[in-house]
Structures are given as C-alpha cells and as structure tokens.
Amino acid sequence: MESLRIYNTLARDKQVFVPRQSGEVRMYVCGITVYDYCHVGHARMLVVFDLVQRWLRAIGYRVTYVRNITDIDDKIIRRAVENGETIKSLTDRFIGAMHDDESALGIQRPDIEPRATEFIPQMLGMIETLETNGYAYQATDGDVNYSVRKFANYGKLSGKSLDDLRAGERVAANDAKEDPLDFVLWKRAKPEDPEGTSWASKYGMGRPGWHIECSAMGCTLLGEHFDIHGGGQDLQFPHHENEIAQSEGATGQTFVNYWMHNGFVQVDNEKMSKSLGNFFTIREVLERYDAEVMRFFIVRTHYRSPLNYSDVHLDDARASLTRLYTALKDVEADTLALDWNEPHAQRFAAAMNDDFNTPVAVATLFELAGEVNRTRDASLARQLKQLAGLLGLLGREPRAFLQQASGAAQAGGLAADEIEAKIAARVAAKQAKDYAEADRIRAELLETGIALEDKPGGSTEWRRV
C-alpha cells in the first residue's frame, strides 16, 4: 500500500504523512460553538474529519481524536440573554442537538470531546506563560492581549504578513491595544455580564478569548507538539494563525506538523453563511433527505474543493446512493476479511492515501457495483460493502434503504396567517421559558416544509424549504 500523503496548508503542498510517534496519530479539530442548531457547513466539517479518523484507523494507526466544543462565547451569551435562560441550559440543549445530528449522519464520536469551560485553569496558565515570555500584556481596559509583532513567524500559516494585514485588513480600532492586530487572550468581565460567564484570575474576573481555548485544550490533551490540526477553511486566519502564535510562544516548539482545512459549502457560488441568509440547518435538510444521502453528498466531493449545495445535487446523490444499494439487493455477501491485495481495494486505498481523494474512492465503489450487477458475485458484494463502510456508507440492509419514503417533504399547505399564528405561539412558549414546546412548534412547522430563523431582537422569519 502506498504511503499516505496529506495536503499540509502550512507547506502549501502534499506531504508524506510521518507521525511523531510510530503507529500513533494525535489529531485535534476545531468543533462547534453551541448557540444554535448545526448547519450544512458544520456537517461538512464533521463528516470530513470523521472520514480522516476512520481512514487513519483503517490503515493501522492508533488514533487519539480530539474535537472541542466552544461553550462560552459572545454569541452564546447574547443568545442566552435573548432567550432568558442560563448559559448551561442553552449550551447543553444545543450540544444534545449536535450529538443527535452526528448520530443521524453516521459520525463516530471523537475520543475526547472537551468543553472550553472545563479547561479555564489551563488557559490561564498558558496566558501567564505568554506574559512571562513577553508575548502578552494587560491593556488599560483590563483585557489581556497577545502582541502579534513579538511573534516573528506570525502569518506563516496563512501567508499574510503583518504589513499586508495592516494595509489591507479591516481591523476594529481599540485604543487599549498596542497594535490594532493584537488579539484578546482574556476578556475582563463587564458589570452587565450574566452569571456563569466569568472566572477569577490574577487579571481580574473575566473569560477566555476564543483562540486561547483551542491552544490550551490541544496542548493539554495531545501534548505541546502533535500531528494533525483540522478545521474549516474559514478558520485558517485568524483562528489557526493565532493558535500557532499562542502555542509556540508559550512552549517554544512546533505546535502542529500537518494543518488540514476543508473547503466552504456554497449556495449559488456564494459561501453558505448566516449573514447572507442562505444557510440550512442539518435538521432542515434531514426533513427532506435521508441522512445517508446527505453524508454521501458530502463524501463524494474532495474535502478541499467547494461543495455546492442545491436540491439538484442532493437529488443526484440520492439517485447515486440508490444505485449502490440496488447492486447489493438480493446478493448475499460473503463474510471474509477485506484483502488489500484485491484490485478494487488497492485502487480505493491509493485514492484515500492521496490526500483522502474520496471522488476517486467513490468511483471505485461504482466500478464494483457494476461488476456485482453483472456477476452477482458474493465476494465482490462483500468488497463493496467493506470499502463503502470505510466511508460510513452502505451500512443498512439494501431493502430497508430502498423501501424508505423518498422525495422531499411536502409543504402542508399552511397559509401565511396560520404560519404566523404558530410563530406567535412559539414566541409565547419561549417567553414562558417552555423551550420544549417552542422546539416542538419549530419541528412541527419543519414537517410541513416551513423553516424558521430567529433574528436579533426577538423577531422570527420563515421560509418554505
């Protein structure tokens, strides 16, 4: 079997993967900030790094996979205040929803799933070390900031120089910072901050900045120098750049050897995002499509390429997955172990070892399906199931998949005034802090093809999906 090669964002090239310790891989992936339901962009990240850890294990590595949860953040605080609920109530609810979405998509849970609030002492320890090493300072407003000009290699991941950033980036002015590009490590608490959002420190009551959370959790759980760090392309700068500056400023050694970034999800050639109003939650998609169809839709595109979201592409994914299941119908696969010397297995492995080239791996599945259709051979059927299983696919009985209800959920014919009445009932439920009833109304509307979007200030918009 060929050696695994990974596209390393830091090197801007594919490199042969060599773990720091033979036979072991330590991998950290930036997880989700839990203040709302996961959207399709989150789904892509979750599926991509699920594939990565599955393949690493399949080729014999012992993997420690850490994916964090950000459970303290300005967005979380704002949402909790809007809802009139505690931070813990909000984050627990959306962590549960995230786990439900993951289970539906066949995503294996990471080995360790730390919450940021569980590692406050480690974050403060790293901040104090950065201060001792000359990289951090407490500003006049009480915040503790990182001095980017003190870190000689700032910009090595993103390729952005400090001069370019100062000339071209829009940076919010802050008179308390020594440089507008400096970023916060510790935010001084404000009088209006709700309970449960501040911790005691030598710098005063406050909470961690977003970037220090991942540095501290990664170094604590995987060591100060580990193999792979992953996340969405949008995290490359500034989040991952700042992680490098923090971690290497604190430890004096290389933080991570291989940086992996998955591409954006696009709608009509624009990035899917809440600010553009063109995003869909996983739950909205699963109201209309089987979860394995959604997973297949993500898997068949290379992880670094843009993923174009549309009903047409999801319908095509459903038809393609149906072809694979149809090939297995009425063929009893044998139960032998997977033989990597088999030609299809070799082609599949070569694709996956070439920077997780899932389009070529999926093409190999269709080659196998064609041969199964032609020969009805039990050995080929077994290979098809085994190789697809490494991608988290074809795990059900073919008839169970093929007999399921297909097609999009039909709109229930609700008139606009009926929809508005249900929204009003949901608002009343939220005001009464009956969040279960509010969630039930949202789900009921989704079943009829109506998606809700809560806006800042308490208003709610709806659209047909």
Curated annotation (Swiss-Prot):
Q: Where is this motif: 'HIGH' region?
A: 32-42
**What cofactor does this chain's UniProt record say it requires?**
Zn(2+)
User: What Pfam families is this protein classified in?
Assistant: DALR_2, tRNA-synt_1e
What Gene Ontology cellular component terms go with this record?
A: cytosol
Q: Does the keyword Aminoacyl-tRNA synthetase apply?
A: yes
A single GO BP annotation from the record? cysteinyl-tRNA aminoacylation
> Which InterPro entries does this entry report, sorted A to Z?
Cys-tRNA-ligase, Cys-tRNA-synt_Ia_DALR, Cys-tRNA/MSH_ligase, Rossmann-like_a/b/a_fold, tRNA-synt_1_cat_dom, tRNAsynth_Ia_anticodon-bd
- Drop me one GO molecular function for this one: ATP binding
| SMART domains linked to this entry | DALR_2
**Reactions accelerated catalytically:** tRNA(Cys) + L-cysteine + ATP = L-cysteinyl-tRNA(Cys) + AMP + diphosphate
Complexes and interactors: Monomer.
HAMAP family, alphabetically? Cys_tRNA_synth
Specify the protein name.
Cysteine--tRNA ligase 2
Give the species this sequence originates from.
Answer: Burkholderia lata (strain ATCC 17760 / DSM 23089 / LMG 22485 / NCIMB 9086 / R18194 / 383)
